[in-house]
């Protein structure tokens, strides 16, 4: 049998709470900077992930196309450096919701997802620690995220999914890489 050794070092760079810019290109630039500064080597099994929300501002003209263009540029930059992007659309909290239910319902924004999430986590706050409430449901969340992905693939979307694919999250890929 194979003995798996894991050395996981998770760093959060460029989060809103740290005052960092959170647009896709800025997140990738910060990841590249971190990767270079810390001599992270994809060829030696290291990985760098950028976790991003859809965060569509529907007040902008043609918001989906504008956001998709930025995402496409970020993906090209990330691919060139071996960086993975985990997207959650419309927001990260959709991943949390999948711990409790499967849904393909369109969610316009964070408040819409939070409203659904509070059915299961009534006191949910964005900066709160919900790990203990979610941990035992991780396998369900992974299964539900894969089902959402299959739903979109069967409905004429193709990977990598863009911002028009809502709801969606591939956070499960990051989580599976840590398990």
What label would you give each PLM region?
Residues 2-15, 32-49, 54-179:
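C-terminal accessory helical subdomains adjacent to catalytic cores in phosphodiester-
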């Amino acid at each position: 049998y194979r003995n798996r050794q894991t050395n996981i070092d998770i760093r959060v760079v460029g989060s809103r709470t740290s005052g960092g810019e959170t647009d896709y290109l800025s997140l990738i630039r910060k990841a590249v900077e971190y990767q270079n500064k810390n001599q992270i080597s994809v060829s030696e099994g290291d990985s760098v992930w950028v976790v991003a929300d859809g965060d569509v501002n529907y007040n902008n003209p043609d918001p989906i196309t504008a956001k998709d263009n930025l995402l496409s540029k970020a993906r090209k930059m990330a691919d060139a450096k071996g960086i993975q992007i985990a997207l959650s659309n419309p927001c990260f909290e959709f991943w949390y919701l999948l711990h409790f239910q499967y849904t393909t319902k369109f969610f316009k924004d964070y408040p819409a997802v939070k409203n659904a999430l509070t059915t299961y986590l009534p006191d949910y706050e964005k900066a709160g620690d919900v790990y203990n409430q979610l941990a035992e449901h991780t396998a369900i969340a992974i299964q539900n995220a894969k089902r959402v992905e299959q739903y979109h693939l069967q409905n004429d979307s193709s990977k990598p999914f863009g911002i028009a694919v809502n709801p969606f999250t591939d956070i499960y890929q990051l989580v599976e890489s840590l398990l």
